[in-house]
């Protein structure tokens, strides 16, 4: 009687349309219940039985029920699942398998089976890549996944590397292929093999892509020739090797080893500017005036060179600082080092006065044993030899940016627009509360940005600098010339690392077209998208492996009285994030460790401060002493507490 009853259907429709609904993201808790977060202000409670239908991070539409003043959400429709492809640890044996996703808030095992054609017998503890196949909100009875790739066994010492690379879907090894002979590019190469070129790198570096030569000129001027390895002399555009490099976009540098963009025969041998080996290069000859200005007679040309010495950063720095027992092998090499130090001094002063100079942060290096165990983590401060290379490279990249802009009007440029215009007024208001007066319009210009940065650098602490960081836009890769506010430069295009950056290879090809007087094709914008995405993935992979190794390294310090100096890098409602000064590890200090009475504690991300009873006790950039309370290996997180 009620079947196909139009009135009943209408009533159902009416009820459905009158029921309140909300779209948001599921946030799980460790207690079984969860929340539907609609926006920063509004969230709804999801009871434990309803949480069985969803997963942390799912974007869903839910029906909102109100009972006795309390609202709760009942998941109804899946908008976007949180998990699609993921990595995890396998449980059980071949006939009954499940996988636990490797994610801090996903604790439940998901039933699964191996995909057809995957020839591996999975066992307890194996790491695998899986893809979700079923979801309760899609009408399935339960969650279900398919194992699509075996990563490695549970006790493999190199789990941090293999799992991280699989998670981000990145290559594990160097590309195949070999380039046996140089291309005929129709370039005339200047023979500079008699000049005393030197390379300065870490002792372990094999892929040397830059060599330097300096010469004193009359009128207190200096000449610098920057010679860069020439992989495009071996790799034709559109060839198999070129396509592989285009996909990788960068060499991926992880703690302990790298995965090169080019085959190792090229990156570490044929293209590497090894000492006493003749190599083809793309070179830039520039003249620096007494105050460090790059004069207009910039010249790009093809050449052959023979590096006369592979110098090492620390040894060169020691010698220039009159310490250590290393000596340059000849007076000619010593003279090169002295001239390069002079160039560094001039260019550093020029950038300080006319552009911007980054504050020096140390590099942290993991020292690993045979089995991937962390023997030590050392902070390597940026010393004079590092700055010599950095100043030479920045100068060379400024030259390329100018030449490509003026001769072609395009290239692969690093562009940074400073502050987002939408934030200019809020930025000016924030600075005003700290006694700095800036014009909201002026700060959006390159000069205005540089002026503000210099004022911030002159502040006694980095606190204000950290406050305005959220107003800054991100650096981008563009085919269009544009300013780089972060460096304080009108234009910046890198070409000095073509062995490890595909964008630099593109700029090499464009510079060669300029040298030959040929027309060149503008690079496709898609390539900049691929490069930006790869840069993001490589950085995430480096961070993930680092987190794993830091957790391994600090595990035996948990619960001990060992003190670490730590800089506060971020404050949130839940506590503070700190960076250990000696080794670079990031640790979290939960709010209850800061003060026992929650009502007397205010942790403000907005202000970058922690107040107890109305008094500011901690602020971002403060350095405090901490001990390690706990290291959670399954989430690779380090929990610290302040030393009382």
From Swiss-Prot:
<dbReference type="InterPro" id="IPR013223">
    <property type="entry name" value="RNase_B_OB_dom"/>
</dbReference>
<dbReference type="InterPro" id="IPR004476">
    <property type="entry name" value="RNase_II/RNase_R"/>
</dbReference>
<keyword id="KW-0007">Acetylation</keyword>
<dbReference type="InterPro" id="IPR050180">
    <property type="entry name" value="RNR_Ribonuclease"/>
</dbReference>
<keyword id="KW-0269">Exonuclease</keyword>
<feature type="modified residue" description="N6-acetyllysine; by PatZ">
    <location>
        <position position="501"/>
    </location>
</feature>
<feature type="domain" description="S1 motif">
    <location>
        <begin position="561"/>
        <end position="643"/>
    </location>
</feature>
<protein>
    <recommendedName>
        <fullName>Exoribonuclease 2</fullName>
        <ecNumber>3.1.13.1</ecNumber>
    </recommendedName>
</protein>
<dbReference type="GO" id="GO:0008408">
    <property type="term" value="F:3'-5' exonuclease activity"/>
</dbReference>
<keyword id="KW-0540">Nuclease</keyword>
<keyword id="KW-0963">Cytoplasm</keyword>
<comment type="similarity">
    <text>Belongs to the RNR ribonuclease family. RNase II subfamily.</text>
</comment>
<dbReference type="Pfam" id="PF08206">
    <property type="entry name" value="OB_RNB"/>
</dbReference>
<keyword id="KW-0378">Hydrolase</keyword>
<dbReference type="InterPro" id="IPR001900">
    <property type="entry name" value="RNase_II/R"/>
</dbReference>
<dbReference type="GO" id="GO:0006402">
    <property type="term" value="P:mRNA catabolic process"/>
</dbReference>
<dbReference type="InterPro" id="IPR022966">
    <property type="entry name" value="RNase_II/R_CS"/>
</dbReference>
<comment type="function">
    <text>Involved in mRNA degradation. Hydrolyzes single-stranded polyribonucleotides processively in the 3' to 5' direction. RNases 2 and R (rnr) contribute to rRNA degradation during starvation, while RNase R and PNPase (pnp) are the major contributors to quality control of rRNA during steady state growth. This RNase is required to decrease expression of RNase PH (rnp) at 42 degrees Celsius during starvation, which in turn represses rRNA degradation.</text>
</comment>
<dbReference type="GO" id="GO:0008859">
    <property type="term" value="F:exoribonuclease II activity"/>
</dbReference>
<dbReference type="InterPro" id="IPR011129">
    <property type="entry name" value="CSD"/>
</dbReference>
<dbReference type="Pfam" id="PF00773">
    <property type="entry name" value="RNB"/>
</dbReference>
<dbReference type="Pfam" id="PF00575">
    <property type="entry name" value="S1"/>
</dbReference>
<keyword id="KW-0694">RNA-binding</keyword>
<dbReference type="InterPro" id="IPR012340">
    <property type="entry name" value="NA-bd_OB-fold"/>
</dbReference>
<dbReference type="InterPro" id="IPR003029">
    <property type="entry name" value="S1_domain"/>
</dbReference>
<dbReference type="InterPro" id="IPR011804">
    <property type="entry name" value="RNase_II"/>
</dbReference>
<dbReference type="GO" id="GO:0016078">
    <property type="term" value="P:tRNA decay"/>
</dbReference>
<dbReference type="GO" id="GO:0005829">
    <property type="term" value="C:cytosol"/>
</dbReference>
<dbReference type="GO" id="GO:0003723">
    <property type="term" value="F:RNA binding"/>
</dbReference>
<feature type="domain" description="RNB">
    <location>
        <begin position="189"/>
        <end position="516"/>
    </location>
</feature>
């Amino acid at each position: 009687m009620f079947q196909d009853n139009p009135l009943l259907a209408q009533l159902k429709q009416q009820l459905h349309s009158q029921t309140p609904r909300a779209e948001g993201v599921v946030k799980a808790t460790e207690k079984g219940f969860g929340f539907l977060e609609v926006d920063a202000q509004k969230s709804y409670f999801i009871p434990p039985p309803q949480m069985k239908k969803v997963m942390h991070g799912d974007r869903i539409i839910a029906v909102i029920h109100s009972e006795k003043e309390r609202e709760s959400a009942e998941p109804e429709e899946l908008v976007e699942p949180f998990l699609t492809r993921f990595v995890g640890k396998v449980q059980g044996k071949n006939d009954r398998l499940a996988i636990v996703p490797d994610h801090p808030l996903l604790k439940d095992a998901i039933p699964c089976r191996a995909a057809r054609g995957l020839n591996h017998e999975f066992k307890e503890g194996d790491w695998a890549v899986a893809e979700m196949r079923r979801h309760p909100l899609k009408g399935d009875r339960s969650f279900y996944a398919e194992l699509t790739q075996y990563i490695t066994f549970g006790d493999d010492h190199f789990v941090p590397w293999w799992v991280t690379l699989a998670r981000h879907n990145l290559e594990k090894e160097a590309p195949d292929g070999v380039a046996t002979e140089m291309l005929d590019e129709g370039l005339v190469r200047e023979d500079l093999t008699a000049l005393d070129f030197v390379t300065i790198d870490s002792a372990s570096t094999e892929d040397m892509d830059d060599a330097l030569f300096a010469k004193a000129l009359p009128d207190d001027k200096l000449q610098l020739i920057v010679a860069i390895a020439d992989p495009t002399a071996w790799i034709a555009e559109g060839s198999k090797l070129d396509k592989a490099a285009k996909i990788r976009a960068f060499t991926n540098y992880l703690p302990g080893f790298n995965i090169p963009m080019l085959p190792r025969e090229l990156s570490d041998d044929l293209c590497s500017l090894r000492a006493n080996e003749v190599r083809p290069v793309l070179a830039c000859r520039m003249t620096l005036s007494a105050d460090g200005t790059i004069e207009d007679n910039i010249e790009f040309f093809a050449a052959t060179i023979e590096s006369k010495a592979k110098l090492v950063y620390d040894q060169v720095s020691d010698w220039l600082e009159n310490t250590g027992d290393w000596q340059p092998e000849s007076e000619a090499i010593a003279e090169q080092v002295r001239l390069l130090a002079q160039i560094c001094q001039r260019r550093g002063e020029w950038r300080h006065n006319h552009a911007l100079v980054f504050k020096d942060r140390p590099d942290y290096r993991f020292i690993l044993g045979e089995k991937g165990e962390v023997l030590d983590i050392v902070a390597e401060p940026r010393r004079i030899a590092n700055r010599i290379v950095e100043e030479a490279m920045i100068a060379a990249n400024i030259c390329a940016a100018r030449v490509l802009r003026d001769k072609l009007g395009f290239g692969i440029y690093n562009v940074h627009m400073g502050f987002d215009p939408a934030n200019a007024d809020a930025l000016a208001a924030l600075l005003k509360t700290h006694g700095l007066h800036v014009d909201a319009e002026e700060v959006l210009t390159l000069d205005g940005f540089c002026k503000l940065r210099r004022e911030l650098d002159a502040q006694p602490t980095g606190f204000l600098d950290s406050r305005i960081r959220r107003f800054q836009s991100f650096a981008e890769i563009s085919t269009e010339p544009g300013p780089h506010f972060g460096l304080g430069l009108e234009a910046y295009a890198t070409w000095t690392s073509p062995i490890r950056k595909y964008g630099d290879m593109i700029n090499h090809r464009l510079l060669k077209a300029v040298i030959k007087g040929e027309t060149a094709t503008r690079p496709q914008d898609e390539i900049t998208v691929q490069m930006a995405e790869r840069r993001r993935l490589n950085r995430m992979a480096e961070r993930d492996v680092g987190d794993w190794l830091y957790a391994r390294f600090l595990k035996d310090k948990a619960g001990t009285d060992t003190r670490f100096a730590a800089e506060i890098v971020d404050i949130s409602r839940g506590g503070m994030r700190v960076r250990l000064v000696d080794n670079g590890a990031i640790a979290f200090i939960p709010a209850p460790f800061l003060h026992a009475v929650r009502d007397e504690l205010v942790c403000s991300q907005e202000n970058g401060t922690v107040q107890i009873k109305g008094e500011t006790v901690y602020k971002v950039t403060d350095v405090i002493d901490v001990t390690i309370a706990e290291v959670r290996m399954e989430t690779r997180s380090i929990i610290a507490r302040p030393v009382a």
